[in-house]
């Protein structure tokens, strides 16, 4: 089959070589963006007098027909034409004749593919931003129900101090807010047009790059043609931001997996987000949370893969850069899917309030309250820490908890202990006293919820 670029070649590659080099199996994902970019390009060619109006109208009509077919999933692509750009050009020529070959005037596939990817990521990042907001709202909705639900807070996966469950959920809301900010800020760099940079050096045609940027909704153009066609920073930044987001989702997934286990029993995931066992009838496995935790690794891999591809490339375009797309497409799919799944899991999970509160009474997470109690009465904190540590050891040896100790045992440890020590040991009291800024006290959590809801526009 004759290549659209085959003039200087005396023989064609074998089919298996074409298949190895072709990107159409995956870059057909860019079909709508490719046609949209071509529509802007040919419009500009007409406005600049580079192509006659009659040719421009024929090309635009043909492209619009192809765009409608693309949206209906009716286009058939061929490996013989390598990539999405040549496939679309061949289809256009087949439809309107040789005039379709004028579309590529003043343009290279190098600036064309870069434009396609900028358009693609701009759409997908905006979708991701909307989904992040959706997950935040789901977390806030659960948090509102559980301001006064208390649970153990953990360090080293050991019970540390009692906290409000809402406080725990809000920690993830703030993590997601940073993700939202990173993706939002990346749009400034994504929303630049490389179209018109040519292969690497610009073009001799009197094109108007600002006009195509305007038609495509870009905020401006790349100011250097070499940079325009060789830049993949915007994809690397997207993969980096996605890795950070997936890391946050993975951490919450890990907690949901633990909390839904028989050992914790803090939450129950809805049946829609769990599966059973092929052999053990009693099993309810948190598969969706586990998959999100697992898929985080593949997103990390895509980031490292593209960094490795780009690290040794001289300017400008190199075929290595074809490897930028599959990881980008897969990351988009993974991130969007993970956010949708997670929102559903959070919205529908059943919180076992009694199990959480019971757990705060069967440990020593109130030990810090004792140390603070003594410090508030004038004992240096390090001495208080020592006193309470010995009391904890005594409890462990006796098989009891701090609230079970009689007052005389406390008095023997320090004369500063009084009857009110038992109020301090109450987990609910302990939580509610921590009203420093950003703390877990109920009043502070409600104040934080109000701030978050105002930011999310859900008041």
Curated annotation (Swiss-Prot):
Pfam families: ASL_C2, Lyase_1
Cellular localisation: Cytoplasm
NAD as UniProt keyword: no
InterPro entries: Arg_succ_lyase_C, Argininosuccinate_lyase, Fumarase/histidase_N, Fumarate_lyase_CS, Fumarate_lyase_fam, Fumarate_lyase_N, L-Aspartase-like
EC code: 4.3.2.1
Family: Belongs to the lyase 1 family. Argininosuccinate lyase subfamily.
Record-given protein name: Argininosuccinate lyase
Name of the gene: argH
């Amino acid at each position: 089959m004759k290549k659209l670029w085959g003039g200087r070649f005396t023989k064609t590659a074998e089919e298996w070589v074409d298949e190895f080099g072709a990107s159409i199996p995956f870059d057909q994902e860019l079909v709508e963006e490719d046609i949209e970019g071509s529509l802007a390009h040919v419009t500009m060619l007409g406005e600049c007098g580079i192509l006659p109006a009659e040719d421009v109208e024929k090309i635009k009509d043909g492209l619009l027909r192809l765009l409608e077919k693309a949206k209906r999933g009716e286009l058939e692509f061929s490996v013989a034409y390598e990539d999405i750009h040549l496939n679309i050009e061949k289809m256009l020529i087949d439809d309107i004749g040789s005039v379709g070959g004028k579309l590529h005037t003043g343009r290279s596939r190098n600036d064309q593919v870069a434009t396609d990817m900028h358009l693609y990521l701009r759409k997908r990042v905006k979708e991701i931003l909307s989904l992040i907001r959706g997950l935040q709202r789901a977390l806030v909705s659960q948090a509102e129900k559980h301001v006064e639900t208390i649970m153990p807070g953990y360090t080293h996966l050991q019970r540390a101090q009692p906290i409000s469950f809402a406080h725990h959920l809000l920690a993830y809301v703030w993590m997601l807010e940073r993700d939202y900010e990173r993706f939002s800020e990346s749009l400034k760099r994504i929303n630049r047009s490389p179209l018109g940079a040519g292969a690497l050096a610009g073009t001799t045609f009197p094109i108007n790059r600002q006009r195509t940027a305007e038609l495509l909704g870009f905020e401006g153009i790349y100011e250097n043609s070499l940079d325009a066609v060789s830049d993949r920073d915007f994809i690397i930044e997207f993969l980096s931001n996605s890795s950070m987001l997936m890391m946050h989702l993975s951490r919450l997934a890990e907690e949901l997996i633990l909390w839904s286990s028989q050992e914790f029993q803090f939450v129950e995931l809805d049946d829609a987000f769990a599966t059973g066992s092929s052999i053990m009838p009693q099993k309810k496995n948190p598969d969706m949370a586990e998959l999100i935790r697992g898929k985080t690794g593949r997103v990390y891999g895509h980031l490292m893969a593209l960094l490795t591809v780009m690290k040794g490339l001289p300017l400008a375009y190199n075929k290595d850069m074809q490897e930028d797309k599959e990881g980008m497409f897969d990351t988009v799919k993974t991130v969007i899917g993970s956010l949708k799944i997670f929102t559903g899991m959070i919205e529908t999970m059943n919180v076992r309030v009694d199990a959480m509160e019971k757990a705060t009474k069967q440990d020593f997470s109130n030990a810090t309250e004792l140390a603070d109690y003594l410090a508030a009465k004038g004992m240096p904190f390090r001495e208080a820490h020592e006193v309470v540590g010995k009391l904890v050891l005594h409890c462990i040896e006796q098989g009891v908890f701090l609230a079970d100790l009689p007052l005389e045992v406390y008095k023997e440890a320090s004369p500063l202990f009084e009857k009110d020590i038992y109020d301090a040991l109450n987990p609910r009291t302990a939580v509610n006293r921590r009203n420093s800024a950003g703390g877990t006290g109920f009043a502070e959590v409600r104040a934080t919820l109000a701030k978050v809801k105002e930011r999310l526009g859900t008041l």
